[in-house]
């Protein structure tokens, strides 16, 4: 499985979950009903909420996704890791911003990953490839 396929699989799993968006009176009322029934409600991002079950599933899906990438790094699967870095660099317009933080966040890492010499070499290869492919 390449990175794009992994990401699409992750997205399908996330899309199967039930989230509430508290942007309308109806959904705010639903949140209050859950709380009144002593159910835990979690704020997951940008006005989205999940009950305990969906929150736990989201965390598990995310952990599985990130662990898959970590294992590919541990295995030194250059094709997969370079493809993942390239994909996220493209997704976050890295050639313009040169903001590694957004790319790393999408992959489940922070700047500490650059302490891994092998990863840094693969990052550099993906960056060079992207810059040569980019339509300036």
Describe every region a protein language model picked out.
Residues 1-136:
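Soluble, non-transmembrane alpha-helical interaction regions
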